[in-house]
Regions:
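Helix-to-loop junction immediately C-terminal to a conserved catalytic motif
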Residues: 71
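ABC ATPase NBD Q-loop/coupling interface
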Residues: 80-98
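Conserved ABC ATPase "signature" region
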Residues: 87, 134-152
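A short, proline-enriched helix->beta-strand linker immediately N-terminal to the Walker B motif
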Residues: 176-180
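Catalytic Walker B motif of ABC-type/P-loop ATPase nucleotide-binding domains
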Residues: 182-185
């Protein structure tokens, strides 16, 4: 059973303590606002190695903003973002650049270059950031494409394949530099339930094969439950629950119950 910690910032709520393990990323009391809109309000969360963690919460609650903080694309107004023991905003520009190489990122649409075929899209980071020979790049790229089931589509343009295939190509590109951390920003967006389930299976398979820290942001409750080792719930810019995946579905927190059950009754409204 996970220990439960009282946190005054949660206005009486409780949250499950972080999972045991080596923390690769830590967010400490992070605040971020855009204009007068406060997105993150003292967020504290950490992510451990060799696990798949999913962060969930309503639209506009700061999940994608969290990802941008972790990869160093946004600087917090207050607080610290620690990656591999280093505060990334106390690091130099060159050090942040090197840290980003340890990340793989899968965006909602795959973020592929439309003028490049699948092979060249996946090869792009290797050509940009390494001095590998083309023959070595070719072998490496085809291995990744085989892993995601796209080796026969390497020559096709993104417009010539399905949305699910574009996401798998983006996944292959995200893994091409052998990252220690992989971030997924709503990877199931636009996919039907079957393709979502298959993508979840692929994520688990690749994590089992390559290890590392995988962090997913999604609204898909069934995918979060089946794909994750841990689930964190964010509401109003704060962490309201964090623990083993099944624990979230047994939470006594009113918001967590409402969100995961998809019910209209509860503290979460239309605004």
């Amino acid at each position: 059973m996970d220990a439960v910690l009282a946190d005054p910032a949660l206005n009486g709520r409780h949250m499950v303590s972080p999972p045991a393990g080596h923390a690769t990323m830590q967010v400490r009391n992070v605040h971020k606002k855009f204009g007068d809109f406060k997105v993150l309000q003292g967020l504290n969360i950490e992510f451990v190695d060799d696990a798949i963690t999913t962060v969930m919460g309503p639209s506009g609650t700061g999940k994608s903003v969290l990802l941008k903080h972790l990869v160093g694309l946004l600087e917090p107004d207050e607080g610290e973002v620690i990656v591999f023991g280093q505060d990334i905003w106390k690091a130099s520009e060159d050090e942040r650049y090197e840290l980003r190489k340890r990340f793989g990122v899968l965006f909602q649409d795959g973020a592929l270059f439309g003028s490049m075929n699948i092979f060249d899209n996946v090869a792009f980071p290797l050509r940009k950031h390494t001095d590998m020979a083309e023959s070595e790049i070719g072998d490496f790229v085809m291995t990744r494409l085989q892993e995601v089931g796209l080796d026969r589509s390497a020559h096709k343009l993104p417009t010539e394949v399905s949305g699910g295939m574009r996401k798998r190509a983006g996944f292959a590109r995200g893994l091409i530099m052998n990252p220690d951390i992989v971030l997924f920003d709503e990877p199931d967006s636009g996919l039907d339930p079957v393709r979502t389930s298959l993508l979840c299976d692929l994520i688990q398979q690749m994590h089992e094969q390559h290890g590392g820290t995988y962090l997913l942001v999604t609204h898909n409750i069934s995918a979060a439950r089946s794909c994750s080792d841990y689930i964190g719930m964010i509401w109003q810019g704060q962490l309201v629950h964090y623990g083993a995946a099944d624990d979230a579905f047994n939470s006594d927190d009113e918001f967590v119950r409402q969100f995961l059950a998809g019910e209209s009754a509860g503290p979460l409204g239309m605004d």
